[in-house]
């Protein structure tokens, strides 16, 4: 069974993404901040991580979590897709520079998200 990690500080967003992906045969994990994301990714090694960039109040935001995961040989191969309300070119570039493989701006199309997940899962 393929594994997906959803990372967002807002429980509503995590639940929305999970409901969107329930059509597939996936094992879904969630984390509410970057530190938890790194811990879960190291323990479970998901096939894809869907991660928010901004997580106010968190010691580790999505960009820093992405950097940590991509610099760790044990997790560097995990595909990371950023999900963010920040959609400026500079935000997208910051995500790419941190190591993100793709970037979706919120609100995102559920169909596009499903297609991206299926593409990544199919490649792994």
Give the role of each language-model region.
Residues 18, 60-64, 87-102, 115:
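Alpha4 helix (beta4-alpha4-beta5 surface) of REC/receiver domains from two-component response regulators
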Residues 39, 61-76:
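Short amphipathic alpha-helix used as the core "switch/output" element in two-component signaling
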Residues 44-50, 55:
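Active-site beta3 strand of CheY-like receiver
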Residues 11-29:
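Two-component/phosphorelay signaling modules centered on CheY-like receiver
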Residues 108-117:
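C-terminal output helix
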Residues 72, 86-87:
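Short, conserved "switch-loop" micro-motifs in signal-transduction and mechanochemical regulators
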Residues 45-47, 73-79:
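His-Asp phosphorelay/catalytic-motif detector in bacterial-type signaling
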């Amino acid at each position: 069974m393929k594994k997906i990690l959803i990372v967002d500080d807002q429980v509503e967003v995590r639940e929305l993404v999970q409901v969107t992906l329930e059509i597939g045969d996936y094992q879904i994990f969630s984390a509410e901040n970057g530190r938890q994301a790194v811990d879960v990714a190291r323990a479970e090694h998901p096939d894809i991580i869907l991660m928010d960039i901004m997580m106010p109040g968190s010691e580790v935001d999505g960009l820093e979590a992405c950097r940590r995961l991509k610099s760790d040989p044990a997790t560097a191969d995990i595909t990371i897709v950023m999900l963010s309300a920040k959609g400026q070119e500079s935000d997208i570039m910051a995500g790419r520079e941190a190591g993100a493989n793709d970037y979706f701006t919120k609100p995102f199309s559920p169909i596009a998200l499903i297609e991206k997940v299926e593409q990544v899962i199919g490649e792994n």
